[in-house]
């Protein structure tokens, strides 16, 4: 086993230790990142020469950009790993392609996991309603193919998105779509009986399953946008650096207001705040979460009796475990010469 493979194993161990700490304490100790940087720069330079230095600094710049919407400690791990992936002819805009794969895979897994949690929590609503919408989609497409109606697909998909939004706001409509969704198998059987040629020619069963999966995915995204992030009430005294508030705290001369806003409402609020050039001070967290200064302000407001003793904090998931999984996948794909 050569030195580079030994270093890959050492990095895996360090990432694993960082992941365990991230799960337990939601922090990434600097000692792991610093150890990786020192080891990887030395070994990377030994194997790849100046390419390792280029890889390090170009990835650092990329990670500084990424850290605007993510935790800085998380993305620094990509920078630390860059020198040992600086293979010749593997650079894309001065960044090793293996690091880009690692970032993409890690972020993909990190995005899929909370979506899976939403599906597990709301599957009794999402799946029957998605079956109803797939059935409606199939029926409408049947007539579109017969009469060749132009631009109908755009209208149909707009209806699907609108229907999901409405079902989130109107409980009776949601129950209506859920009940009709149970007719989905009967719809497939009925279509097969009345027009077997069409059913086979357009492979209706397979396309229906694909459409069903697409609509379920759209539903999960809309559920997330309309406020099903998992959140917990947290006492002011228990707030920590990095916590992401679901609440927005608005401070002006007339008093303090705490608003519990979902993603869509937060975006709308920020746009209105910027357009109106509002001079009100706001405490609103991004991917970095609360800073120590934010926590001091919140505690001061609490001591003055201006805000409640508990705030809504979005439940987040440690990112480093996803990096570990991505790291293993990238190494396996490299060794198998797939990437």
Swiss-Prot record:
Membrane topology of this protein: Multi-pass membrane protein
Disulfide bridges in this chain: none
Organism from which the protein derives: Methanocaldococcus jannaschii (strain ATCC 43067 / DSM 2661 / JAL-1 / JCM 10045 / NBRC 100440)
Class in the EC hierarchy, top level: hydrolase
Record-linked InterPro entries: Pept_A24A_C_arc (IPR009639), Prepilin_IV_endopep_pep (IPR000045)
Subcellular location: Cell membrane
Reported function: Peptidase that processes the N-terminus of prepilins.
Name of the protein this chain belongs to: Prepilin peptidase EppA
GO molecular function terms noted in the UniProt entry: aspartic-type endopeptidase activity
GO cellular component: plasma membrane
Extent of the signal sequence: none
Family statement drawn from the similarity comment of this UniProt entry: Belongs to the peptidase A24 family.
Positions of transmembrane segments: 3-23, 27-47, 48-68, 75-95, 99-119, 125-145, 146-166, 180-200, 204-224, 319-339
Keywords tagged on the record: Cell membrane, Hydrolase, Membrane, Protease, Transmembrane, Transmembrane helix
The enzyme's E.C. designation: 3.4.-.-
